[in-house]
């Protein structure tokens, strides 16, 4: 079992569930915009949020931001040790630094500040911060992260979270497998510079999913260029798909010429309406009744299209026939029945 560390009220590692993180895209010193974005992330299910700290104004804004949010806040500092200390003084629940960019004395000061507040430090490496380069870049990546860990250990600091990321899926997997064998600290998973939309989702799902299936990884961030809320939604879906998080899974047929309903839009609408439900339930959206009910019989709840409407089925049993405009309303009714049954 991995060592556990506490980030605000969230435990990472040990027997704690895998947590979902994201990072704001706003200028941190713009408190109003930053808080607004964090609240959107909270509503999506984000459990830890990271902000970029590029100057004193950003560091000092942390205190005001924390007063208005519910989830732990991580300060991301690249070079200036003074910004790390100032972020800690202003209430950061964790800092992310690169100890290799600091002198021994400066690192001592940062460690002393973190110890004084009882907060952890995340260290690690990505392809842009590799200390040495050989033919095995994944190993160079992992060894660079281990060097960062050793620098903190030399200062007597052990509340550490480790991260090794590449934009390459296989490098990310190999580097994290190597790290997992070398240290007992919690591991932060992600694919850096993953790209936009489908590309980022595919890369992250493969790398993160593979590692979690091997019991490697304690907290995740799905990096997607653009709105960070999407990162949280995809991260939660990865955990639900792996059985590591309770939630509603919407399955849908790939569609063919027999489809009598707009499967894609119906599935999206159901996901949006039921994403908040924290129970392990499966909802099927099937285009027709020819194969739909049979293929969706493993679902707890489902809908199959008819030429002039749809049928609602629960655990493979048809409950009623409805017109298409009432599908969502009736699904909500049967979902509430299922939730009451689960609670009993």
Curated annotation (Swiss-Prot):
Biological processes annotated in GO: isopentenyl diphosphate biosynthetic process, methylerythritol 4-phosphate pathway; terpenoid biosynthetic process
Pathway: Isoprenoid biosynthesis; isopentenyl diphosphate biosynthesis via DXP pathway; isopentenyl diphosphate from 1-deoxy-D-xylulose 5-phosphate: step 5/6
The record's free-text note on cofactor binding: Binds 1 [4Fe-4S] cluster.
Binding site residues for [4Fe-4S] cluster: 253, 256, 288, 295
SUPFAM superfamilies for the chain: Dihydropteroate synthetase-like, Nitrite and sulphite reductase 4Fe-4S domain-like
Catalytic activity: (2E)-4-hydroxy-3-methylbut-2-enyl diphosphate + oxidized [flavodoxin] + H2O + 2 H(+) = 2-C-methyl-D-erythritol 2,4-cyclic diphosphate + reduced [flavodoxin]
Keyword list, A-Z: 4Fe-4S, Iron, Iron-sulfur, Isoprene biosynthesis, Metal-binding, Oxidoreductase
EC code(s) of this entry: 1.17.7.3
Keyword Cell inner membrane carried by entry: no
Pfam family for this entry, one: GcpE
Cofactor: [4Fe-4S] cluster
Disulfide feature: none
Gene Ontology molecular functions: 4 iron, 4 sulfur cluster binding; 4-hydroxy-3-methylbut-2-en-1-yl diphosphate synthase activity (ferredoxin); 4-hydroxy-3-methylbut-2-enyl-diphosphate synthase activity (flavodoxin); iron ion binding
Coiled-coil intervals: none
Entries under HAMAP family matching the protein: IspG
Family affiliation: Belongs to the IspG family.
Function description: Converts 2C-methyl-D-erythritol 2,4-cyclodiphosphate (ME-2,4cPP) into 1-hydroxy-2-methyl-2-(E)-butenyl 4-diphosphate.
Record protein name field: 4-hydroxy-3-methylbut-2-en-1-yl diphosphate synthase (flavodoxin)
Species per Swiss-Prot/TrEMBL record: Thermotoga maritima (strain ATCC 43589 / DSM 3109 / JCM 10099 / NBRC 100826 / MSB8)
Gene of this entry: ispG
